[in-house]
Amino acid sequence: MAEFEQRFRIRAPTSFLSSSDRKMIHDAALEILETVGVRVHSANARKALKGAGALVTEGSVDVKFPKHVVKSLVAKAPKTFTLGGRTKEFDLPLDGTHSYYTTDGCGIAVWDAKTKSRRKPVLEDIRKTALIGDYLPYVSIYEPMVVANDMPERSHVIHGMKVAMENTQKHLLSESTTNSDEARAQIQMGAEVLGGIEEFRKRHYISAMLCTMSPLMLDGIATDAAMVWAENHCPIHITSMPQAGISGPVTLSGSVSMLHAETLSVICIMQAHAPGSPMIYGSVPTSMDPKTGSYMGGSPESTLLCAGAVEMARHIGIPNSTGGFGSGAKAPGIQASLENAVSAMTCAAVGGEVVNGLGVPDGSTLLTYEQFLIDHEIAGMVLKVFKGYPVTKDALATDLVKKVGIGGSYLAQMHTIKNMREIFMPMLWDSDPFDMWVKKGAKDPMARALEKVDEILKTHKPVPLDKSVSEKLGTIVKQFK
């Protein structure tokens, strides 16, 4: 366990917002909740909120949240907890000292590198990407990356989760749970993998996502499903996704305060329903193109919105996740890589704990295998930068500098041999001299990424589930109708 989670440890985060900025945003969110409220389309959620002191009017789905109710309910959410892997080796402590990276999910198309066109995703894409994610050292969490079009609409989520469980040992994130039955089926599957429901509830093997409907609305069926997850101690990624200027204020602080209000409302629901259930303050806010109103994922404004949400999660002491790889690029390449690098660096700088989005640009709709590998390379570089470096007697190497002296070489020194393994070794970037690069085919990063994908798929063998467990998962899938 220690070796895996240590690679994601980072230095203390910085801040774009001052403490007074954060207080103003928080106070604005509380005012929104108390005076405007949230439209809660779940009768179960409204009942739980009413019992906790929220203002629920008979015959209305709008709920208002007095400040003291919000404070009381948010205080019930745990400040730290661990996301479990299939085995404890891949456990991920959420304690504010790590930055983890997860694949994106629910892509509705796949980029074909040969034809430069799109195709429909299938279940095999989930198997392949789960296997690749299992192999890649900086992928911490796997989320089924596409919607499997070759599976029945009713059960494609369950099919995808089974394939994910069979092809990676890492923590799993369920993004697309659409109803309570899907949640129960996935919980049953997780319990089979871990050997029982109590172990499943204790380990937090699966976390689930609940997206708000900005501005200030919650879908009833999805909220009911999240309540089932919460009952079973599955961490809920509360994901608010306002588009500044369309479904949120165009000013960044305005959109952050509104998404903060939405997030607080969901924390209140889950803590009223299942006190002490683990919450993750998620956020994937974006900006708009002022000329067309279209989505601009990966813009500086989108990046700052994500950073602001991370800071507000830290303000209330809740673990966070955010969309650090949310490029709006329509294909793999320079735009996707540049936008993702800037966003990922920014999210890590402010203490992003779970950074979402590897491999699925164009507003989290397009799976591209080569961009998946490029994004992974970016994640590794970001982690290396924010891990920092030690300042110790050995690291300062003053005695060695005296020994080598002026004009000497450090290459053959034992100190160099011992410490050079700490240098970041890229999987895809080229560092050969020009002539050697040409001799090897003058391949660009995209070509090398595709070659690496083929190599991983041919050679990596994930640790399989016991045959009896796979059979039980298959039975659950067949019974899901």
List where the protein language model places each region.
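Catalytic-core signal marking the mid-to-C-terminal active-site face
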Residues: A2-F4, S15-A28, V36, H41-A48, ...
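Glycine-rich, N-terminal phosphate-binding loop and its surrounding beta-alpha-beta segment
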Residues: N44-T115
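Short acidic (Asp/Glu) and glycine-rich catalytic loops that position anionic groups and cofactors
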Residues: F4-R9, K50-T57, Y205, Q243-A244, ...
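Helix-rich catalytic cores of soluble enzyme domains
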Residues: K120-A349, E353
